[in-house]
């Protein structure tokens, strides 16, 4: 008999078929307490779990005594209780490599669209305000040869640095847990402490996961240290930034603009002050949202679950020691 798994995110037909070749697949809409209660017998027998954008916590795991592996269609896993999973010897798989280039594209798009005010001036054109040759009130700022500060020099940070260095001749500063020799050799990137990065960068790009240590890492103190002409970009995790402090910094003119793909609460509230600011480009967590990349992530997650339930945890496993 095939192992039973629960799928809580729709998959393309070919990937669903691949999953069904290995498992008995039960599809549910979400992982809410009501859904779990209504499908208690299925959850009690499931050995695998696959999906995204749902919380997997100790309360859910209590309902899934046979669970051996869970696979998320994402690189981030802050909605998973890793300690609870590990304590129960449940493997957690994710998709860290598939989306690197696409998220770096999104970051570069935010850099360009904020600096050149693309969204703002496009809306002005649509509103019929372009009635003569444009003047300084339509101008943006240059990107080329400006200093880019990257906070978090992982795979995505490296891909962003490549674009900025070779495509836009931007000097690169970075702050990370350790020196990154490859970044320094390939892009002439300079490691510095966070305060120095904030003070010297024209663009500050935040690419950090959410952990206890990074929660609200950026607040009023950090924004006050940035140039008044600086542009802040976040495509990591929303709660790494104190959003109220960001709003205040923008309102007071402590920073020039912001390009945001992530927020403390998602979806972003329609009454958020960020949405009324012309110097803010706010997009709905589109970092990896292309047809090609989202398919690749789903395919990777399917393969990850197959591997995990076969005891193969050489790659893409958050807690591989569980398999020891």
Swiss-Prot record:
Gene3D superfamilies: NAD(P)-binding Rossmann-like Domain. GO terms for biological process: D-gluconate metabolic process; ketogluconate catabolic process. Optimum pH is 7.5. It comes from the Bacteria. It is an enzyme of class 1 (oxidoreductase). It is found in: Cytoplasm. InterPro entries: D-isomer_2-hydroxyacid_DH, D-isomer_2_OHA_DH_cat_dom, D-isomer_DH_CS, D-isomer_DH_NAD-bd, Glyo/OHPyrv_Rdtase_B, NAD(P)-bd_dom_sf. Induction: Constitutively expressed. Belongs to the D-isomer specific 2-hydroxyacid dehydrogenase family. GhrB subfamily. PANTHER family: 2-HYDROXYACID DEHYDROGENASE-RELATED, GLYOXYLATE_HYDROXYPYRUVATE REDUCTASE B. This is Glyoxylate/hydroxypyruvate reductase B. It comes from Escherichia coli (strain K12). The gene is ghrB.
